[in-house]
Amino acid sequence: MGIEGVLEKGFVTTSADKLINWARTGSLWPMTFGLACCAVEMMHAGASRYDLDRFGVVFRPSPRQSDVMIVAGTLVNKMAPALRKVYDQMAEPRWVISMGSCANGGGYYHYSYAVVRGCDRIVPVDIYVPGCPPTAEALLYGILQLQNKIRRTNTIAR
């Protein structure tokens, strides 16, 4: 967490930024936005073998209850407004993980007229997880990278 000092009688000193970011990294609640086969790997990551609950990651069904959106799969033009609407309904601070080649840049369907060539054209993306489909380990690594990114951010304006 970044303990700055330990005082007598069991007191610990740290900054408010470090304390808030430590709490945020321990309770990431992702909104699952599974669009294709990558969603199966996302479910695999939440199952007993990898158990994302031990990292404080609890999948939520509502955007108002979540602070992370995992976009997994091919984003088509008809689904893009719905993706943006769900993103806008999430509370601040919010983060987006783009999972798979299709979500990152269109993937196999890149040249199709109906496919958005990357969900970063619709919502700002914080972490890209490559693969077709990416493994559960890759998603887990992406979540750990997001936790590292959150730890480095400043919460309180100076």
From Swiss-Prot:
Where can this protein be found? Cell inner membrane
Under Enzyme Commission nomenclature, its number is: 7.1.1.-
What is the free-text note on the cofactor?
Binds 1 [4Fe-4S] cluster.
Q: What gene name is listed for this protein? A: nuoB
What is the protein's name according to its record? NADH-quinone oxidoreductase subunit B
Q: Name one GO biological process term.
A: electron transport coupled proton transport
Q: Which positions in this protein are listed as binding [4Fe-4S] cluster? A: C37, C38, C102, C132
Q: Where are the transmembrane segments?
A: none
Query: Which reactions appear under catalytic activity for this entry?
Result: a quinone + NADH + 5 H(+)(in) = a quinol + NAD(+) + 4 H(+)(out)
Report the protein's function. Answer: NDH-1 shuttles electrons from NADH, via FMN and iron-sulfur (Fe-S) centers, to quinones in the respiratory chain. The immediate electron acceptor for the enzyme in this species is believed to be ubiquinone. Couples the redox reaction to proton translocation (for every two electrons transferred, four hydrogen ions are translocated across the cytoplasmic membrane), and thus conserves the redox energy in a proton gradient.
Q: Which GO terms describe its cellular component?
A: plasma membrane; respiratory chain complex I
Q: RNA-binding: is it a keyword of this entry? A: no
| Family in the record | Belongs to the complex I 20 kDa subunit family.
Q: Which PROSITE patterns match?
A: COMPLEX1_20K
